[in-house]
Amino acid sequence: MNDYANITQITLLVRRLDIGTKVIRVRQHSQENQLFKYRKDLSYPPKEKVKLARANMDGQPMFYGAVFSNFCINDNPRLTCLLETNKEVLDDTFVGKKDLTYSLWLNKREINLFVIPVFDSYPHPAKDFEWYYELWKELMQDDRINKEQINVLKELSRHFSLTGEKKEEENSYAYTADFTTHLFKTHPEIDGIIYPSVRLKEEGIGAVSYTHLTLP
């Protein structure tokens, strides 16, 4: 078992999404002039098409999306989704066309998302994560988290801050996906995770959930 197993036994900081909270999601088109007419086309991907990603193993569907900041009035979850799913946006050498469909979802019940701590892995995280990090520091100062657990949390934060695209980062997705899987198994009250968007210079807020949301 990985060394992060014991951190799921400590006090978890959670962001709760109230009923009706907006979640933005995007899907890339696989062909020109493609239209999605059904909710299922924009929801969870088919199991057989799911590959290893930041919070899931091969064949393990998860609901990826972006949520609005509680602090920043100019927050744009659509931009977060775009950058998280299309690395070509930041590639000056890319020439071509890509079609996308955005969808707006509302959660049917309260959803509890485990907040990934930022530590020093994120130079400029969204204020939402800075606020939670202050709570993490209180836990550490009160000795409710020991040094070993702190080191594991820092390592977890570091892996979440990587895109997994560079050769030296290729194991990061396996690490974070394994953690997320273990978290859900040991804490059924946790519905997903929330983390800073790396490709938006940590300003966006990404969220992953395995619970069901619905189109408005």
Model region roles, listed by residue range:
Residues 61-164:
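ADP-ribosyltransferase catalytic core
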Residues 11-13, 118-119, 198:
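Compositionally biased, low-complexity/repeat regions
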Residues 31, 69-70, 198-200:
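Short, glycine-/Ser/Thr-/acidic-enriched flexible segments
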Residues 1-60:
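ADP-ribose/NAD+-binding catalytic cleft of ART/PARP-like enzymes
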Residues 211-216:
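Conserved small/polar residues in nucleotide/adenosyl-binding loops
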Residues 172-182:
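Phosphate-interacting basic helix/loop segments used at nucleotide- and nucleic-acid interfaces
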